[in-house]
Amino acid sequence: YEQLTTVIFGPGGSRKSFLGLWLALLVENGVALEGAVRAVPGRTLYLDYEADQATAEYRLGRFVDGNPALAHASPSYRRMKQPLAADLPVLSASIVEQGIVFLIVDSLAMACGGKDLSDPSTAVSYFSALRQLPCTSLSIAHVPKNTENPMIYGSVFFTNIARMTWEIKCQTDEDTGSSTIGLFNRKANERRHRPMGLQFAH
């Protein structure tokens, strides 16, 4: 949703970070992914709490190797060292200065700064911080272990406040390293989207 919040959630190793970078690359280059990403190009910013710039650049490079049409523009990158709310003044200024239209937060739990994710106030504070940033956002979240009904880890308010949520499922071929990804729209404030499938070749 334009100017609103979407959350993608799934277990570790389900290629959530890959997907976040891929979506950022599509927006940067104005390439549409039906049902998920608009075709109008725009600047994107990737907030990384989990890895480093070298890792992000390597992954982006692999995407471009397989899709040369995406070589024209690349997302801005920021390695995060403190909670999202604590970085708001600098982030807001940077978003305005660079004309950022799409923000990826990887990951939601780290961006909350170690607060109790089961506490509703943590979810409220997180989304309140996002609303102060003048752009559309995608947050990448984990799921609880050993549950039959996967949901965003922590308070149900992470789901309730998000305008849209997608569950990601992944199967990786151990021989080739290629991953088949399924995306399932679990919540939509306007209308639900059909499931989507992607394949990332190693």
Predicted regions and their residues:
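Pre-Walker A (Motif I) flank of P-loop NTPase domains
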Residues: 2-6, 42
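Phosphate-binding/switch region of NTP-binding enzymes
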Residues: 7-8, 13, 17-18, 102, ...
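Conserved inter-motif catalytic segment of the P-loop NTP-binding fold
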Residues: 12-14, 38-121, 125-128
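Active-site catalytic microenvironments for nucleophilic, acid-base chemistry
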Residues: 26-30
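Conserved hydrophobic/aromatic pocket- or pore-lining residues that grip, position, or stack substrates
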Residues: 8, 24, 46
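Conserved Walker
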Residues: 31-39, 149-155
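Hydrophobic positions on the alpha1 helix immediately C-terminal to the Walker A/P-loop
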Residues: 19-23
